[in-house]
């Protein structure tokens, strides 16, 4: 599996709107395994995880026009571009 762990820094007063944006219209694309967004107890930046079956599926998703459009809408709610940590998941266990 391949994917990204990323931080989202919402503009002041925009966290709830950002969460709503992320909830709506976010279908898992072909090759996607799942994705998650964490709202930390310390009220810091949101933390996201996107998981794909492999790097090829991850790259194909990033290149989709719909993904770019969604990213641009998300950027309107952020102070800065997300920080991305892309790589291969080496341990995964489900309960």
Which residues make up each language-model segment?
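Short, charged, surface-exposed hinge/linker loops at domain edges
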Residues: 43, 86-87
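Short, low-order "capping/linker" segments at domain edges
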Residues: 51, 87-95
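Short amphipathic alpha-helical segment that frequently serves as the phosphate-/nucleotide-binding helix
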Residues: 19-23
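N-terminal short leaders/motifs
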Residues: 1-2, 94
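Residue-level detector of flexible, active-site-proximal loop/helix-junction positions
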Residues: 12, 42, 91
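Short, well-ordered beta-strand segments in beta-rich or mixed alpha/beta enzyme
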Residues: 2-8, 34-63
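An amphipathic, aromatic/His-enriched active-site/gating alpha helix that lines ligand/cofactor pockets
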Residues: 24-34, 51-85
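Short, surface-exposed ligand-recognition loops at beta-strand->loop->(often short) alpha-helix junctions
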Residues: 7-18
């Amino acid at each position: 599996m391949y994917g990204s762990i990323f931080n989202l820094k919402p503009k002041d007063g925009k966290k709830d709107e950002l969460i709503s944006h992320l909830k709506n219209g976010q279908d898992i694309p072909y090759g996607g395994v799942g994705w998650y967004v964490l709202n930390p107890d310390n009220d810091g930046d949101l933390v996201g995880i996107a998981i794909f079956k492999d790097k090829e599926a991850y790259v194909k998703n990033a290149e989709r026009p719909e993904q770019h459009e969604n990213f641009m809408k998300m950027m309107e709610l952020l102070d800065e571009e997300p920080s991305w940590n892309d790589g291969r998941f080496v341990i995964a266990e489900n309960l």
